[in-house]
Swiss-Prot record:
Gene3D superfamilies linked: 3.40.1380.10, ATP synthase, gamma subunit, helix hairpin domain
Name used for this protein in its record: ATP synthase gamma chain
One annotated Gene Ontology cellular component of this protein: proton-transporting ATP synthase complex
Lineage: Bacteria, Pseudomonadati, Pseudomonadota, Betaproteobacteria, Neisseriales
Matches recorded under CDD domains: F1-ATPase_gamma
Self-association and partners: F-type ATPases have 2 components, CF(1) - the catalytic core - and CF(0) - the membrane proton channel. CF(1) has five subunits: alpha(3), beta(3), gamma(1), delta(1), epsilon(1). CF(0) has three main subunits: a, b and c.
């Protein structure tokens, strides 16, 4: 029964692995719900900032703020690449990187260079491994990242845009659609589109003019930064929800596969045990007949 003992050892090993994957599935489910709640709570802030910024931009058309310039010749582009810090989340990071690298190659074919800010260690390692130009990064962001952790890399990129060293900035991340579906997304963060600086509020028979201190332009310049930061944070929250959903699905699949493997191993064990018992009985019967 040496073979039977080996099979039992393997069954116990798979059972231990199944316990781990089941625990990871439950943890990911809990984290996904918390991240979804954080996404929901962040949206009203971003929308209010956008509305006030839009109102100010429409009433101060000669603002001269570089971050609100709409037309530039594209010579160099920036990317904010958002990935996870950890693996075991299926093809989530691979899909985002595939979309990102395709866009980088398209720009290079046009003679346009890139500068990259990586948020998340998986994207950073991928960019470094193929020699892309990473100018700043933020990794090990944790389950509840603070905006302060992102300010350094983002400020670096935004300042380069203000100095006309970068002419366009893309935001690349994994968008959360639902628990079973996440899709890689690429959006133009800068220049800010006309759809953002559009109608600042629903039409109403009443309207108000506000007095801003110290000046309307100073408030507008401040709000533009806050708006851009809120968009990036929203994308980061989206990516984290996608990560937890993908990990939950991957761990559920691993748990189910472990269960199937255990069933197959038990079947093999029972067959081998039955064969051994049959052999022993045959030997006993043969011995009795010989006597």
């Amino acid at each position: 029964m040496a073979v039977g003992k080996e099979i039992l050892t393997k069954i116990r090993s798979v059972q231990n692995t199944q316990k781990i994957t089941k625990a990871m599935q439950m943890v990911s489910t809990s984290k996904m719900r918390k991240t979804q709640e954080r996404m929901r709570l962040a949206r009203p802030y971003a929308e209010k900032v956008r509305m006030v910024m839009s109102h100010l931009a429409q009433t101060n058309t000669d603002h001269g703020i570089p971050l609100l310039e709409s037309h530039r010749e594209i010579r160099r582009v920036g990317f904010i690449l958002i990935t996870s810090d950890k693996g075991l989340c299926g093809g989530l990071n691979a899909n985002v990187l595939k979309k990102f690298l395709a866009q980088v190659q398209e720009y290079r074919n046009q003679g346009i260079e890139e500068e990259i800010v990586c948020l998340g260690s998986k994207g950073l390692m991928a960019c470094q491994s193929i020699g892309l130009n990473v100018i700043a990064s933020a990794v090990n962001l944790g389950d509840t990242p603070k905006m302060e952790m992102l300010l350094g890399p983002l400020t670096e990129l935004f300042q380069r845009y203000e100095k006309h060293e970068i002419d366009r900035i893309h935001l690349v991340y994994s968008g959360f659609v639902n628990t079973m579906r996440q899709e890689p997304r690429m959006e133009v963060l800068l220049p800010i589109g006309e759809n953002v600086i559009g109608d600042s509020a629903p039409k109403s028979p009443f309207s108000w003019e506000y007095r801003y201190e110290p000046t309307a332009l100073a408030v507008l310049e401040y709000l533009v930064r806050r708006y851009l930061e809120s968009v990036v944070y929203q994308a980061l929250s989206d990516n984290m929800a996608s990560e937890q959903a993908a990990r939950m699905v991957a761990m559920k699949a691993a748990t189910d596969n472990a269960g199937n493997a255990i069933k197959e191993l038990r079947l093999v064990y029972n067959k081998s045990r039955q064969a051994a018992i049959t052999t022993e009985l045959s030997e006993i019967v043969a011995g009795a007949a010989a006597v």
